Amino acid sequence: MSSILKVENVTMQFGGVVAVDNLNLEVNEGEIVALIGPNGAGKTTAFNVITGVYQPTNGAVWFQGDKIVENHPQGKMKKLYKGEEAGSYTHVLAPTPDKITQLGMARTFQNIRLWKSQTVFDNVLIAKHCRTHTNFLAASFRMNHREEQEQRARVAQLLETVGLYDVKDELATSLPYGKQRRL
């Protein structure tokens, strides 16, 4: 199996407090992995570093073989993300987490964020908006039918993967708490 996420020697300090200390982990394609620990152990901070919300004090994060977050020994941090040309990189001082999301990695939050008046299926479809490629003209004249069909098929596949396909037509708020978290 190939590595989809690699966290290498990541440390995150806030003043004198070390919230994450030399974190190393590797997640292979197809694996579902949980980060478990007591309150205050640094789980949320680790996710915030991995997804680009925080800049690490030390270490690097790789996603799908590309380095997306890196701290240089001199203390000058730079984040990297794919540029327009395949294989090229654009170096910026502080890209927002949406750049990392565009690469295909997103995170969930401790508080559930659902569109309460929407179905389970529609919640996932709405969340996939950053994966659509329709321009204004195509959307205005409903020329995006094929892409819409592809998005709907992908949503069905995702719901099947997490065991929510059977409740796809239910309102998101009608689900038990555990299933809402999965959604």
Residue ranges of predicted features:
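Conserved structural motif at the start of ABC-family nucleotide-binding domains
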Residues: 5-7, 20
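The feature captures the beta-strand-to-loop junction immediately N-terminal to the Walker
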Residues: 36-38
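Helix-to-loop junction immediately C-terminal to a conserved catalytic motif
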Residues: 51
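Conserved ABC transporter NBD signature motif
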Residues: 59-71, 77-89, 103
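Conserved ABC nucleotide-binding domain
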Residues: 89-94, 158-177
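Q-loop/switch helix immediately C-terminal to the Walker
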Residues: 111, 117-139
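Conserved ABC ATPase "signature" region
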Residues: 135-167
